[in-house]
């Protein structure tokens, strides 16, 4: 069935990434088109730039934190994507719409709480404000 084919493609993609095995472009495209959200998260999980697969040193905020009032208002669930410094500079200079069209992207993803907790230590300094706000939100929930 179609669901089995999608599940198998996801399994293959994750297996190839986990084991640093080069993959056919067709497998990557199937996975990318079949589940964009998982595709982006896998790149976060493995510190890979969404564009070139090099080490992702940057976390691009699709929703600009400046619009939210600055980094002190940054939330872990804001939409973002993992990028290398070259591609992060590019998206900042040419803009989101042009960048997404150029690389056929569907945008960033909002991380779930579980995803955020699993990757926050891989991107040193990029989630500092998010972490502080996350802790404040949790404290307020418990009051």
What are the roles of these predicted feature ranges?
Residues 33-60, 86:
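Short cysteine-rich loop/turn motifs with clustered Cys
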Residues 1-25:
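Charged, alpha-helical interface segments at or near domain boundaries
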Residues 27-39, 62-70:
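Short Cys/His-rich Zn2+-coordinating modules
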Residues 47-80, 94-97:
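Histidine-centered nuclease catalytic patch
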Residues 71-78, 89-143:
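Polybasic, low-complexity binding patches
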Residues 7-11, 78-86:
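Short amphipathic alpha-helical segments
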Residues 1-6, 35-42, 74:
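Short, charged/polar micro-motifs that form catalytic or ligand-binding hotspots
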Residues 17-20, 53, 88, 92:
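Hydrophobic/aromatic-lined pockets within catalytic cores
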């Amino acid at each position: 069935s179609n669901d089995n084919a999608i599940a198998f493609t996801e399994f293959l993609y994750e297996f190839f990434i986990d084991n640093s095995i080069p993959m056919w472009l067709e497998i990557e495209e199937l996975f990318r088109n079949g589940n964009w959200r998982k595709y982006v998260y896998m790149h976060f999980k493995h510190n890979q730039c969404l564009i070139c697969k090099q080490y992702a040193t940057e976390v691009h905020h699709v929703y600009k934190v400046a619009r939210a009032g600055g980094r002190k208002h940054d939330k872990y669930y804001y939409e973002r994507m993992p990028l290398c410094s070259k591609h992060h500079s590019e998206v900042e200079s040419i803009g989101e719409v042009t960048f997404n069209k150029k690389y056929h992207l569907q945008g960033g993803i909002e991380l779930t709480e579980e995803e955020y907790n699993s990757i926050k230590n891989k991107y040193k300094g990029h989630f500092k404000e998010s972490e502080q706000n996350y802790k404040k939100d949790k404290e307020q929930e418990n009051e």
